[in-house]
């Protein structure tokens, strides 16, 4: 076992069978329908999906939750019924009973197998219904447990509003109004080739170019092409115009302002172009980018992270998802986005490619170390020096010392289920535990690059071997490795917990970490409580056995 661990000095990645052994991804409905308060989730699947939602979520029928099942029967699967008419009937019933702001269709394995065209039906039905319909595929064939939320947020990101063009131009132009209007500054503008199409229609051209062109310097260049008598020379103190220029100007030190003339209305056009031009490159840093966080968190946890960033002088412009569908954040090229969960790679890709946002690649705010690194990365993007993070992290670790004594030196094995494994492993290594293996259903190394780097750094600082990372692990091989390594704790899915417990392997359900509040500084104890609970149980069993003089410290004999 020692040789096996010593060989792992750097991160190693392996991929085994390619099968998903995880919780069903449609379970994302359980927390998303509570997060988006004016939504309604319609899961389109079979009775199996309905049984899963009823049993796994533990919601009674009379509670009237804001989700429902559209059960597919044999006639639906054999294509004897019109899917559109049936979904239309259900959606109109939902509108009449609940009147939500948005309806989310959740596709399942069945809709994927029979190739239901949900994306094709949704726009037409949306026009008839008058309520937005978001389509997300959360089938267990293609996605792991928590990736159900990823598909929903990726679909919802495309529904986020964009900043109107005139508003965006106005926000950029307001900064330009405060800067110098000298030809030297004008020459530094970003140029976009936009020339006159008809040089004879001067009056029409000027008014058209005033509205069409965002760059005044490019506008002047176009004038030089069609009117040789008009010229601009770069000089710090003056602007030289030829005597035959058709617009009367006056020379002013460092700035030029056209005189309004009743004989020629073109002077007014120049004046507005100068005052409403685009922002210069040297002043681009004055445009304060917005920050949008994506990932579903309980409102209390979201507030905690917001306050942590506010302490650093950073304001959050919005969340994806928002509490109400109408409050979705505005996304544009001046928006920075940062994730709070490691399973949101598809959402991050959509935000970058479709919405042209800038992604902040940071470790995830899980544990004091991860939260500190997450805040530091955001501060670096905004050019702010972090204040008090070292002291805050140290104080949190001191408060966890009673639990750290129990886990320090213990070993843990992740079988893989919820895609939180790398962040949890990094935190537990910082707590003093040894991680033998990190099994994970799916790993996007680009999206989790910062988390992987922090994991490697943590292993180096704690002087422990770097664990092996196995993507889509084979459970049979994992059982063999568990039998060989004999870890103190195995974090696994619900399907494997009881069989492992029957073989004297202490387990913890990974699904509990998904539903627990584990983000931020103050919730680090929640993670340790989940980890130490089975370890404390073993201690109590050992004490019980010693009290009665039993030679067996466990109730079940090893059956390996």
UniProtKB/Swiss-Prot annotation:
Q: Where is the composition biased (Low complexity)?
A: 173-182
Region described as Disordered: spans on this chain: 173-210
- Which residues lie in coiled coils? none
Output one GO MF annotation.
oxidoreductase activity, acting on iron-sulfur proteins as donors
Q: Which InterPro entries match?
A: LIPOR_BchN/ChlN, Nase/OxRdtase_comp1, Protochl_reductN
Main subcellular localisation: plastid
Cofactor(s) required, per the database record: [4Fe-4S] cluster
| Ranges of compositional bias, category Polar residues | 196-206
Q: Which residues bind [4Fe-4S] cluster?
A: 24, 49, 109
Give the pathway annotation: Porphyrin-containing compound metabolism; chlorophyll biosynthesis (light-independent)
**GO CC terms for this protein?**
chloroplast
Domain of life of the organism encoding this protein:
Eukaryota
Keyword 4Fe-4S included in the entry's annotation: yes
Mention one GO biological process in which this protein takes part, according to its record. Answer: light-independent chlorophyll biosynthetic process
Give TM segment ranges.
Answer: none
How does this protein assemble? Protochlorophyllide reductase is composed of three subunits; ChlL, ChlN and ChlB. Forms a heterotetramer of two ChlB and two ChlN subunits.
Q: What is the recorded function of this protein according to its Swiss-Prot or TrEMBL entry? A: Component of the dark-operative protochlorophyllide reductase (DPOR) that uses Mg-ATP and reduced ferredoxin to reduce ring D of protochlorophyllide (Pchlide) to form chlorophyllide a (Chlide). This reaction is light-independent. The NB-protein (ChlN-ChlB) is the catalytic component of the complex.
Tell me the protein family, please. Answer: Belongs to the BchN/ChlN family.
Which HAMAP family would you find in this protein's record?
ChlN_BchN
Q: What is this protein called?
A: Light-independent protochlorophyllide reductase subunit N
Naturally occurring in which organism (per UniProt): Tetradesmus obliquus (Green alga)
